[in-house]
């Protein structure tokens, strides 16, 4: 019990902050309301250092827990800075004009509380050692995001996206929960380590295999992988850009961590020389990875909305990351570049940073009527009209492409080397072809942002003071 409590300090810090922001967000004093995001900042910093100093565990992947929590806290802090000022902007403008603050109209407290609840669930996912714990952690990660999508913008499109997101999320939860039930029926336990021991001793029964396959398909919704990807472009476009950035990282990270734990029960010791998942699972993931990266990249070519391009790009990145899952951890004590799970975790970090940077630029560009920049013409020439935002956008987009020597190149290189080391040459060829396809729409975004067209629009975009967002929110 003491050991379990020691590794849960990051979650405890976040939960305490969640309780506090629900109070401060509704406080009549504006100074206290503006302090709300800073409570989250302190909690995330404490969670980061708590994860850094947490003791080693005896779980399935003992090195994953502290590293994953540090990544979650760091990227969560970046997302928090982006989320600040997303809600209650008009309410604060009305207060400046002398109107009385009405807490019943304010969403600030709930908005930050839902964000912190989601991050708490994500960290609990990384700490999971039981199927019931894993299910509850995944749902705690996902449920707040449905509400955040709905409240992020005062438009019908946000509500429509939230409803679609919720019902598909409920369907996926039912699928992977049924898979968990089959796994329990096949092994008689919900403890992940005990499940792995049963599978190792007695083999994987047909019921256990069916349970694993259903769990994988259900969790694929979290990572926006084919065939559970349909909601992604509509939800990303309907939500405010900061919330879209959160959706691109938080549920995806939870899904991949859950996949690592679930597939770790079966192990990668199959095949003539080991290093492979059971054939039905590996074949399912192989097809899913190839289709996900191909569908995402091809459909991104057809879009004129920047957020829809980034949504399909997010789908494609899930396909890339599945290569790390398929490759597995490699030989015990083997080099880093052969460890697919290590490459996956590093890629999640790089992807989180790149995604937040890209959506931060979109969140900082608004039309005169207050609507966010979204159409590809809205970013035309921003390298010249708004140099800091423009070049930030260019660098993050090139990094998502994997352009050397940027961070995204290093992350993608790890997936390539791990896949080659595991012998999945055909999948690596598909990954290379898809990277070339992705270059078409990524370079299109770069070219448009650099080209200066004085006749571009009768409704130009204006840069908002992004560095003041934390004080505004």
Label each PLM-derived region with a short phrase.
Residues 1-473:
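Alpha-helical transmembrane segments of multi-pass membrane proteins predominantly involved
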């Amino acid at each position: 019990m003491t050991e379990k409590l020691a590794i849960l300090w990051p979650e405890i810090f976040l939960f305490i902050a969640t309780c506090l922001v629900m109070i401060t967000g509704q406080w009549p004093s504006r100074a206290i309301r503006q302090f709300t995001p800073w409570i989250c900042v302190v909690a995330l910093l404490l969670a980061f250092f708590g994860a850094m100093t947490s003791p080693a565990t005896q779980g399935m992947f003992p090195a994953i827990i502290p590293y994953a929590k540090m990544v979650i806290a760091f990227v969560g802090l970046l997302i928090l800075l982006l989320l600040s000022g997303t809600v209650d902007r008009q309410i604060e403008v009305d207060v400046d004009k002398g109107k009385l603050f009405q807490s019943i109209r304010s969403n600030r407290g709930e908005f930050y509380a839902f964000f912190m609840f989601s991050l708490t669930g994500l960290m609990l996912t990384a700490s999971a050692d039981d199927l019931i714990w894993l299910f509850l952690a995944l749902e705690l990660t996902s449920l707040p995001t449905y509400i955040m999508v709905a409240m992020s913008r005062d438009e019908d499109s946000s509500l429509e996206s939230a409803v679609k997101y919720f019902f598909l999320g409920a369907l996926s939860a039912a699928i992977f929960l049924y898979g968990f039930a089959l796994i329990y029926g096949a092994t008689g336990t919900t403890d992940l380590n005990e499940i792995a021991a049963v599978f190792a001793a007695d083999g994987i029964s047909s019921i256990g295999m069916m349970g694993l396959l259903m769990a994988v398909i259900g969790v694929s919704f979290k990572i926006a992988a084919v065939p559970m990807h349909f909601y992604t472009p509509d939800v990303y476009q309907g939500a405010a850009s900061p919330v879209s950035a959160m959706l691109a990282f938080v549920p995806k990270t939870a899904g991949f961590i859950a996949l690592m734990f679930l597939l770790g029960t079966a192990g990668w010791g199959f095949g003539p020389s080991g290093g492979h998942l059971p054939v039905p699972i590996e074949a399912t993931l192989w097809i899913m990875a190839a289709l996900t990266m191909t569908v995402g990249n091809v459909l991104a070519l057809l879009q004129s909305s920047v957020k829809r391009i980034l949504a399909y790009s997010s789908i494609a990145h899930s396909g890339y990351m599945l290569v790390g899952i398929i490759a597995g951890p490699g030989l015990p004590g083997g080099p880093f570049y052969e460890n697919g799970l290590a490459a996956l975790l590093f890629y999640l970090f790089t992807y989180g940073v790149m995604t937040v940077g890209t959506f931060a630029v979109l969140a900082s560009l608004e039309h005169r009527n207050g609507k966010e920049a979204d159409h590809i013409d809205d970013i035309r020439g921003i390298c010249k009209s708004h140099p800091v935002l423009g070049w930030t956008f260019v660098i993050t987009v090139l990094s998502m492409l994997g352009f050397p020597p940027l961070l995204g190149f290093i992350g993608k290189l790890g997936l390539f080397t791990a896949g080659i080391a595991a012998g999945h040459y055909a999948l690596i060829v598909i990954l290379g072809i898809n990277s070339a396809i992705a270059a078409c729409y990524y370079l299109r975004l770069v070219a448009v942002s650099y080209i200066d067209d004085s006749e571009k629009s009768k409704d130009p975009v204006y840069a908002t003071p992004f560095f003041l967002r934390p004080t505004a929110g």
